[in-house]
A protein has these predicted regions:
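Terminal amphipathic alpha-helical/low-complexity segments used for targeting or macromolecular assembly
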Residues: 1-99, 160, 165, 171-172, ...
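Structural signal for interior beta-strand "rungs" in well-ordered beta-sheet cores
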Residues: 38, 95-305
């Protein structure tokens, strides 16, 4: 592809040779003379001056460099779209593999690809242009919208409801029983039936080995446009809003309420029945045990305001030094104070 054509498709201002041929995209240090790269973080600006890439996606105000530049408002977004141009994932032709098991009461939309050893249970409704790769299982009564893409070994349990353009990566489990038990008269833990389904909106991505549990009663809900990373656990009856990002190894206890446009970074935790308001950011390894107002940035365990947390962490790192200073002050004070006798009188 000529660089000029790529610039047009990305809506970029090109400064450089429009006839230059490019055939791929790589990181700033790996890209070669026929590939493009991008700089979204200013700390990598020096690398752009040394890159071997044919062209670099940059912001409009970026200084001139030897390589051609494709100037856009959001280099990271342009990079994402350029990847979609150069990288074409495998195509899966419509059809049903002979080893697939499909209940006769299931409704399969037009253009579906049903891979090897897929199991589709009774009364399933699967929308048009779905792709189910090997060993995907849809339990009875599942309803799924159009353009569903399920990678190998993902499972959707009974009566769960998924919208359009949902993607499940490998090993995802939607609708497994929530963690509910009650102690009986003999002191044994008795399993609480988990009767409520999971309801997932449109354009939701769930990454590998994440789990979203079904509700005891009611529903577990995931809003439109939300993206869930690897190894995330969402407990029963939790509600997650729209366009929220939940990063790897995060855990939401049962009945958590997460708002819209929230970012839960890696290894964060939210206690049961807590509400996290719209636009909140939890920084890595934060733990929330109380409601969080909209727009807050929270850090630490237990979590509190990020600005206070940063000051506290700075102070914590200085504790050994402060302890030494305090010890010196105490010794100086002791040297200037009169000592007491055994009867309490001054010597």
């Amino acid at each position: 592809m000529k660089l000029g054509e790529l610039a047009t498709r990305l809506g970029a201002e090109l400064r450089g040779d429009a006839e230059l041929e490019v055939n791929g995209i790589k990181g700033i240090e790996e890209a070669g003379p026929t590939e493009i790269t991008f700089v979204a973080n200013p700390k990598y600006a020096s690398l752009a001056r040394k890159t071997q890439a044919a062209a670099v996606l940059v912001e409009p105000e970026f200084p001139e460099i030897e390589a051609a530049t494709l100037r856009v408002k959001d280099p990271k977004l342009a990079f994402t779209r350029a990847l979609g141009i150069f990288y074409q994932p495998p195509a899966y032709a419509p059809g049903v593999h002979p080893t697939a098991v499909i209940d006769p009461t299931a409704e399969i939309g037009a253009g579906a690809h049903i891979g090897a050893y897929v199991v589709i249970g009774p009364l399933v409704k699967l929308g048009a242009h779905a792709t189910l790769l090997p060993h995907v299982v849809l339990y009875p009564g599942v309803e799924i919208g159009c353009r569903f893409f399920a990678h190998a070994h993902s499972v959707v349990r009974e009566f769960c409801i998924l919208g359009d353009d949902v993607t499940l990566e490998n090993g995802v489990i939607i609708g497994a029983d929530g963690y509910g038990f009650a102690k009986n008269e003999q002191g044994h833990w008795e399993k609480t039936p988990q009767s409520g389904p999971v309801r997932i909106g449109n354009r939701v991505d769930v990454q590998a080995n994440a789990t979203i549990d079904r509700a005891t009663v009611g529903e577990t809900r995931i809003g439109d446009g939300t993206k869930i990373d690897n190894l995330v656990q969402i407990g029963h009856a939790s509600h997650v809003g729209e366009n929220t990002l939940i990063c790897a190894q995060t855990g939401l206890a049962g009945s958590s309420i997460i708002g819209n446009n929230v970012i839960l970074t890696g290894q964060t935790g939210v206690a049961g029945h807590c509400t996290v308001g719209d636009g909140v950011i939890l920084t890595a390894q934060s733990a929330v045990s109380h409601d969080i107002l909209p727009g807050k940035v929270i850090s630490g365990s237990p979590g509190f305001d990020n600005r206070v947390w940063l000051r506290a962490v700075t102070l914590f790192q200085r504790l050994p030094e402060l302890a030494k200073r305090l010890d010196r002050v105490e010794k100086k004070l002791a040297a200037h104070l009169p000592s007491e006798g055994t009867d309490g009188t001054e010597k």
